[in-house]
Amino acid sequence: MNFNSFRKEIKSGNASVKELINEFFLKIDSLDPKINAYTCLTKEIANSQSEQIDKLISNNEQLPPLAGIPIAIKDNICTKGVVTSCSSKMLQDFVSPYESTVSGKLWSSGGIFLGKTNLDEFAMGSSTETSVFGTTSNPWDTKRVPGGSSGGSAASVAAGLCAASIGSDTGGSIRQPASFCGVVGLKPTYGRVSRWGLIAFASSLDQIGPITNTVSDAAEILYSMSGKDPLDSTCLDKPVPNYLSDLDKSIKGLKIGIIEECFNHPGLDQEVKLSVLSAVDRLKSLGAEIHDVKCPRFNDGIATYYVIAPCEASANLARYDGVKYGYRSDGDTNLVEMISKSRAEGFGNEVQRRILIGTYALSAGYSDAYYKKAQRVRTLIRKDFDSAFDKVDVLLTPTCPTTAFLKGDFINDPLSMYLSDLLTVPANLAGLPAISIPCGFDKKGLPIGLQLIGNVLEEHRILNVANIFEKDADVMKRKPSIEI
């Protein structure tokens, strides 16, 4: 259900907001045992928030912009008084004493908090298979993964278990699962949205963003949660435009760049390639000018990312030692042994792997060869984007090289798993806004996503193109069929 449909239900007066929200909880109770999108539900909070909106309605008072909209939050974003676990044994019992800036803004805007969604442990993964709460299933085929790390967020929207979900994107963790689950996923410009209350993975790459059923819903959520935050020094002090105002603007004459390196990559599935190229033809028919552009270092992004991100993760996760923060092992005779056992038992294999990679790349004698070199390549990738945006307004790629893969296919093959992020990590390295929208289906009936990348703070541009395509292509009408 998109926002407008939900608002019509509220306006009709056939049911109160509280009754409509309880219908969502009934659906979650029925379907989520098969999907496993949620790590916990917040029924008491949702009922209290719903009653407040119902009171405003009964008093004919002005409603906040997201009044009554049911929203789920990824379980690495702090929500006051609710467990924020990062889907890890390390934080399984951590109850946040404060509200993240993003969730606080959403509740102030009238959103209703349904619960927390599943993710790869500490947001490190592309399949939501490394969670301490178990694997999340893709609503289009429950034998397949939903993507990751925001797999629970994407699956909850696709399955109709919320109207919107909030995820985090470090190397594609909003866009890749959005592509796999056939929904809209938006990663804003780095600094557009506050990271206060987001449990850090890689601080120079992390960004919070929405996953929704439609582009206009994503625009609404982005507007509500954007803006300067004194609690986050990396948050940009720039005016927040009304992202809805340009959604229906004609794209006639808009220059869209097709990144050649993406479409020529040997790992790109042919069905994905043909579907995205068909979408390019549709955009051309709608008046856009299509140009081939080169980003020579685009495909170097994945190697660059998997040096920088683990380095930052190894520093960010050093605090979890069982002393001040995180799971603490029992029965140890000394402090060193306790810390060692707590981290070994509290972190899963993938998190430990990335900590080891990062620690090695930052160690004496190796930081020049790995970390500093990766940062130089990151700068070159950003310069490639700058050159491309001198010629075009928006860049277009497939979101992922493939559609959703089967559970277990790559869990023991990390290098193959990492390639799922091949086409999404460059936007994070450059701090650029990017959106994934559905553009078709493969022969197995699995969703295919296309990615639009904009220049810094040009979310309005990619939202405009995405909305025009969405309305013309009408891909979103097709929904997964889930048996209870």
Curated annotation (Swiss-Prot):
One of the protein's GO biological processes: translation
Recorded GO CC terms: glutamyl-tRNA(Gln) amidotransferase complex
GO function terms (MF aspect): ATP binding; glutaminyl-tRNA synthase (glutamine-hydrolyzing) activity
EC annotation from Swiss-Prot or TrEMBL: 6.3.5.7
Domain of life of the organism encoding this protein: Bacteria
Active site: K74 (charge relay system), S149 (charge relay system), S173 (acyl-ester intermediate)
Keywords from the named record: ATP-binding, Ligase, Nucleotide-binding, Protein biosynthesis
InterPro entries listed in its UniProt record: Amidase (IPR000120), Amidase_CS (IPR020556), Amidase_dom (IPR023631), AS_sf (IPR036928), GatA (IPR004412)
Catalytic activity: L-glutamyl-tRNA(Gln) + L-glutamine + ATP + H2O = L-glutaminyl-tRNA(Gln) + L-glutamate + ADP + phosphate + H(+)
HAMAP family named in the record: GatA (MF_00120)
Family: Belongs to the amidase family. GatA subfamily.
Function: Allows the formation of correctly charged Gln-tRNA(Gln) through the transamidation of misacylated Glu-tRNA(Gln) in organisms which lack glutaminyl-tRNA synthetase. The reaction takes place in the presence of glutamine and ATP through an activated gamma-phospho-Glu-tRNA(Gln).
Complex and partners: Heterotrimer of A, B and C subunits.
UniProt xrefs under NCBIfam families: gatA (TIGR00132)
Protein name: Glutamyl-tRNA(Gln) amidotransferase subunit A
Annotated source species: Prochlorococcus marinus (strain MIT 9515)
Lineage: Bacteria, Bacillati, Cyanobacteriota, Cyanophyceae, Synechococcales
Gene expressing this chain: gatA
